[in-house]
């Protein structure tokens, strides 16, 4: 039996509609965590449909961390000015700016990584595997696994979210698209760290 309290709790936790929550709980036989997974899966389907829509509105969010030690600017686009002013969207932008400050990604997505960077990383990983004495026939498989770890480190969308490491940023983005009901795009970002690239003079 699905109670009104269960539907309310699921709605509060996911932001999904009441009927969607009730249906997910029924399909999950009252299992709250399974219902959340079902809603996320269904959200993915909704998000995929919205991903083709033009997102030209949005916000440029800034974040300063550690008494001016690290600064971030990130542009996040949505479809309408109405959503750009929405508190949920603005909080998402803040979360993404904080993620960039903390996790220091180099690219938004793996598609942005130049092919020569990937090839160079593969060559390094191959040499590492051979130096470890791994058999030649398993080296390629090892490289693929380690390359995924590389993507997780350098690509914002592939990184575990600092507020919930069980969720990647791309999952969080998909969740927000489903919840807000518009296509959302993390367009670009810049991260600055005080003194980065400046060689300090040696003290006498």
Swiss-Prot record:
Keyword Aminoacyl-tRNA synthetase (UniProt): no
GO molecular function: translation elongation factor activity
Subcellular location(s) per record: Cytoplasm
Top-rank taxon, per record: Bacteria
Chief localisation class: cytoplasm
Gene3D superfamilies: 1.10.286.20, DNA helicase RuvA subunit, C-terminal domain, Elongation factor Ts, dimerisation domain
Keyword RNA-binding: no
Coiled coil spans: none
Region called Involved in Mg(2+) ion dislocation from EF-Tu, residue ranges: 80-83
CDD domains (UniProt xref): UBA_EF-Ts
Alphabetically ordered keywords of this record: Cytoplasm, Elongation factor, Protein biosynthesis
InterPro entries assigned to the protein according to its UniProt record, in alphabetical order: EF-Ts_dimer_sf, Transl_elong_EFTs/EF1B, Transl_elong_EFTs/EF1B_dimer, Transl_elong_Ts_CS, UBA-like_sf
GO cellular component terms listed in the entry, alphabetical order: cytoplasm
Alphabetized HAMAP family for the sequence: EF_Ts
NCBIfam families referenced in this protein's UniProt entry, alphabetically: tsf
PANTHER family: ELONGATION FACTOR TS, ELONGATION FACTOR TS, MITOCHONDRIAL
Main function: Associates with the EF-Tu.GDP complex and induces the exchange of GDP to GTP. It remains bound to the aminoacyl-tRNA.EF-Tu.GTP complex up to the GTP hydrolysis stage on the ribosome.
Family: Belongs to the EF-Ts family.
Protein name: Elongation factor Ts
Species of origin: Caldicellulosiruptor saccharolyticus (strain ATCC 43494 / DSM 8903 / Tp8T 6331)
